[in-house]
Curated annotation (Swiss-Prot):
Site (Important for bifunctional activity): G116, F117
UniProt keywords, alphabetically: Hydrolase, Nucleotide metabolism, Nucleotide-binding
Binding site for dCTP: K101, S102, S103, L104, G105, R106, D119, T127, L128, E129, Q148, Y162, Q174
Family of the protein in this entry: Belongs to the dCTP deaminase family.
One Pfam family in the UniProt entry: DCD
Protein name per its UniProtKB record: dCTP deaminase, dUMP-forming
The enzyme's E.C. designation: 3.5.4.30
Active site: E129 (proton donor/acceptor)
Region of interest (Disordered), ranges: 163-190
The keyword Zinc is assigned to this record: no
Signal peptide, first to last residue: none
CDD domains xrefs: trimeric_dUTPase (cd07557)
Function: Bifunctional enzyme that catalyzes both the deamination of dCTP to dUTP and the hydrolysis of dUTP to dUMP without releasing the toxic dUTP intermediate.
Length: 190
């Protein structure tokens, strides 16, 4: 069940749904707008010949932070990682779904490639997979509305929520745009 504005406010007021910093003006009829943080991860295309999800490639991306008052310019065809300004914390019986903003989509900005789902138990900043499919550069301003977070109530609390040892939660507690940790899926224990 998708939570309405009144249910979202009730969960936040009760302290079960964490959104920090919280601005009540960002609550929509069935979502909460989230804003863009000031850090971005850009891909270094001169260090590696290819991306291998099975290998740890620490120098694949670099952290970039525009100067105060300056935007980040996302060029046509470019893909970077960003993150929400808000720290999101979900209880064991709520899940989230990040969607883009229609107004930005109409300009050619994609907010996430595949990872729009947030598991119950997650706590951290949501990493954004930002792509410019327009034929002109798009300026991304820190603090701008970048997406909307929908919250879904589970039929029962998750038995093993995100963050529990059994799940292997690679991104619990992440701060800022966090690079892929897919290589951890290939590690075999002996």
């Amino acid at each position: 069940m998708l939570l309405s504005d009144r249910d979202l406010r009730a969960e936040i007021t009760a302290g079960r749904l964490g959104i920090e910093p919280f601005d009540d003006a960002l609550v929509q009829p069935s979502s909460v707008d989230v804003r863009l943080d000031c850090m971005f991860r850009v891909f270094n295309n001169t260090r590696y010949t290819h991306i291998d999800p099975a290998k740890q490639q620490d120098e694949l991306t670099s952290l970039v932070e525009p100067q105060d008052g300056e935007p980040f310019v996302l060029h046509p065809g470019e893909f970077v990682l960003g993150s929400t300004l808000e720290l999101i914390t979900l209880p064991d019986d709520l899940a989230g779904r990040l969607e883009g903003k229609s107004s930005l989509g109409r300009l050619g900005l994609l907010t996430h490639s595949t990872a729009g789902f947030i598991d119950p138990g997650f706590s951290g900043h949501i990493t954004l997979e930002l792509s410019n499919v327009a034929n002109l550069p798009i300026t991304l301003w820190p603090g701008m509305k970048i997406g909307q977070l929908c919250i879904l109530r589970l039929t029962s609390p998750a038995e093993h929520p995100y963050g529990s040892t059994r799940v292997g939660s690679k991104y619990q507690g992440q701060r800022g745009p966090t690079p892929s940790r897919s290589y951890q899926n290939f590690i075999t224990s002996t």
